[in-house]
Amino acid sequence: MKVGYLGPAATFTHLAVSSCFQNGAEHVAYRTIPECIDAAVAGEVDFAFVPLENALEGSVNLTIDYLIHEQPLPIVGEMTLPIHQHLLVHPSRENAWKELDKIYSHSHAIAQCHKFLHRHFPSVPYEYANSTGAAAKFVSDHPELNIGVIANDMAASTYELKIVKRDIQDYRDNHTRFVILSPDENISFEVNSKLSSRPKTTLMVMLPQDDQSGALHRVLSAFSWRNLNLSKIESRPTKTGLGHYFFIIDIEKAFDDVLIPGAMQELEALGCKVRLLGAYQSYQL
């Protein structure tokens, strides 16, 4: 089994893949989210594993838009990973980490550790990299430089770096959601037995073109009177002009034979365009 993921190695996406699939799955890194999804469509890999949402930074719009407008792959699973940011240095700098000349990482990682950096390195410049994994590799490859990197445990072990400060992120409850995509919506796969799971269904709903008054209220009512709990509703532009949006709706329930199909039929009767994006298990560490 091959799993494509947003690379490079030792990023949080790679860590999530490794935490989810632990039975000999081959991990294949891709440079971008579209390349990863395209690889699954082309059959190069069995699954595409890409980020969907971060608790602090919000949704990964590229993932959502590519699934809606370019490659409508079904969501067959979801993985939520807690995000722990650490300060790493080359082993030769372990005892002098407080005198770093520069700190490398992805822009999001640096932003998520602002308080720690302001307190301990108020005048040290930052160097932004394409990913935390790429930044860790650079630090590992340049022991002659007095530099550090913000990254995860996997980056430390992969590139033989020392963790000098753990959990330096500003907020302890930061998590990232990743979706598992496959051309085969009925594909089965084994996950780490230590993961907990719950069912989830995700829909795309586009309001009627005539934009009737109260249309969104009627959409929500179709779920409300059926006691279907929505964990998320988010709008995205349809890319057909200002003021035109579709909605991504997460339902905390397995796709059944009555309630969710009934809600979908009611929405279609209202003139909405409705698409099932996936009915799947959501896994958490």
Curated annotation (Swiss-Prot):
Catalytically driven reaction(s): prephenate + H(+) = 3-phenylpyruvate + CO2 + H2O
Record field: transmembrane: none
GO MF terms, alphabetically ordered: prephenate dehydratase activity
Prephenate dehydratase domain span: 2-183
Residues covered by the ACT domain: 204-281
Family matches, as SUPFAM superfamilies: ACT-like, Periplasmic binding protein-like II
Top EC class of this enzyme: lyase
PANTHER family: PREPHENATE DEHYDRATASE P PROTEIN (PTHR21022), PREPHENATE DEHYDRATASE-RELATED (PTHR21022:SF19)
Protein's UniProt name: Prephenate dehydratase
Organism per entry: Bacillus subtilis (strain 168)
